């Protein structure tokens, strides 16, 4: 049994929640802290691949973070995650090519754990928190959060109430709908007008050799397009299942595993919506369901060779002799042009052509484009202070709340929320 009152309840055991828990447990050991999650084990980026970026602005929402603030907190993130920073080489060669095309190549301090080793990292982190007195309640779904004159706390499974002095809500990207419901019920103003829509590219390492020099190269193109989440070594494209549709994602195993000679990365376009369409989440769900409908209940994939010739890919010809590798995620072969909005596809294709000039080979006919890859983390509450407080005793943080875009930014957001709680003690 667990106590029905805690000093702090943290909803979500991902990096944002963990960051808050570690900071609170370290600086105020007497606090009673409960972490609750609907999953059995911490989900999100820590479980899937666990790629970490330690250079601002990657992973940080620039509206809520200055360089000085990020650089103050990032060493605290490193203290607990203990990253093995990857080396880079030949960066200037690629950077000079990029600059001639008005493309920016960022120099980022990175670490990569790998999907096969991520559970061990999560277990180490949870064991350390348990040793420090933090309680965990897995496989319990929080259905509401409240903060009123009658008290502060959470509701589990629609019936059971647990009281708290403070509540930190960190449900991650998949919790965006829950977060919106809570904000609407509590009359918390929020903005939801940004969404990232794009494709995931899969090819051989020979066609994208930059990954031998720079594990996750961060290219920023004109028109709001960027590369995101590059995986190599033993890399696979995977499905992310949501209620009513599936999205594309990618991951890789650790360097200890035998490679499969494949590379995958996302090309995402950031879209800021204006009147009359204002909900990035609604647009994302619409585009995802449209693609799944065209794909017969699955996402789509198309070879670059077919795309350049203006014809759809078919299941019968997808693995013919011209193509040097089969898809690691065999979804529906088809025509991306039927599903991707024309303006988005035009900007992504322009970015791909520039990337092929910087790293010749990426537009080999066998290269596969998967769609849709969509990042739904656009909720941005109206924060009351720099600690991400949304009401007297409620804090909202992480990718789902728009304070971060990745593991390190989410962890740093948790630290800032924890600082707010400690500041108010």
Predicted regions and their residues:
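Cleavable N-terminal targeting peptides that direct proteins into the secretory/outer-membrane pathway or into
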Residues: 82-83, 98
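Residues forming the flavin
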Residues: 1-65, 88-96, 101-425
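Conserved catalytic/binding loops enriched for acidic/polar residues
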Residues: 69-77
